[in-house]
């Protein structure tokens, strides 16, 4: 293992063991000693509390006025139905909310596959049971699904909504996180002669709406973005000081004498009040040839000297002369 003794090993994604459709074990190694718990705890907290996802937030059931009631012909009471709806695993593409509808009649289970929805909505667990109908009865409901993150209890949303919310619109505790369970374990790892390293094993159970590897990647991105301010050691709200670019190339502000022209050429330019290189480059060949005592030989000399500095005659300079030179002219 090469490198400086002060360099930190960087972990890599070693293995993803898919236990079942919703559970996976992700192993990362090698890590410096102590970093297994440092990173494992940080990723665990982010995966549980900060991962975006979709959840049922509101339900309207025909014939039901409040959650502390029951519906004839339905085996479960309303509270149990709401609890079952919380287990619905849904994804929404291209928007932040969607309205789903469910209508079912006849004895038997009512499952997620019975829900009608748009093409931008995907129900990951179509076999999920919502309730059971008995006899020749029916049930109809409208289900609102929203995108969010974290856990938002119904009581918190009820306080922010208007008092004129229609009777029968039932609010549901929304758990937006697609991660249902997360645990991590730190084991010993070895790289060549070093045996004091950590291996981080993350055991994750999701609702099936996110791939375990993608969940790790998203949580790590969130953590990195939060640490950016510490890396820069400054307030991210402070405006960055932009370096002001000079209005003119500094060479244009230098006196004509710096061109080291012959005495004849220099005197001719001074007679025409051409004191700075910026004054000179704005003149054309025709204008200079009209200058007394300045012939073609002097003109050729001036053109060659300017060309050696990347300049030429006939240039246009906006806002010339600058204020710093205007006072001297």
Curated annotation (Swiss-Prot):
InterPro entries reported for this sequence: DNA-dir_RNA_pol_insert, DNA-dir_RNA_pol_RpoA/D/Rpb3, DNA-dir_RpoA, RBP11-like, RNAP_asu_C, RNApol_insert_sf
GO cellular component terms? cytoplasm; DNA-directed RNA polymerase complex
Similarity section:
Belongs to the RNA polymerase alpha chain family.
> What are the boundaries of the region Alpha C-terminal domain (alpha-CTD)?
248-329
The UniProt function text for this chain reads: DNA-dependent RNA polymerase catalyzes the transcription of DNA into RNA using the four ribonucleoside triphosphates as substrates.
Q: Which SUPFAM superfamilies does the UniProt entry name for this protein?
A: C-terminal domain of RNA polymerase alpha subunit, Insert subdomain of RNA polymerase alpha subunit, RBP11-like subunits of RNA polymerase
Assigned EC number: 2.7.7.6
Note down the stretches annotated as region Alpha N-terminal domain (alpha-NTD).
1-234
Q: Which reaction does it catalyse?
A: RNA(n) + a ribonucleoside 5'-triphosphate = RNA(n+1) + diphosphate
**What are the TM regions of this chain, as residue ranges?**
none
Q: What is this protein called?
A: DNA-directed RNA polymerase subunit alpha
Please quote what the entry notes about the protein's domains.
The N-terminal domain is essential for RNAP assembly and basal transcription, whereas the C-terminal domain is involved in interaction with transcriptional regulators and with upstream promoter elements.
The UniProt gene name for this protein comes to rpoA
Q: What do we know about how this protein assembles, alone or with others? A: Homodimer. The RNAP catalytic core consists of 2 alpha, 1 beta, 1 beta' and 1 omega subunit. When a sigma factor is associated with the core the holoenzyme is formed, which can initiate transcription.
Q: Which GO terms describe its biological process?
A: DNA-templated transcription
Q: Which UniProt keywords apply?
A: DNA-directed RNA polymerase, Nucleotidyltransferase, Transcription, Transferase
Q: Which GO terms describe its molecular function?
A: DNA binding; DNA-directed RNA polymerase activity; protein dimerization activity
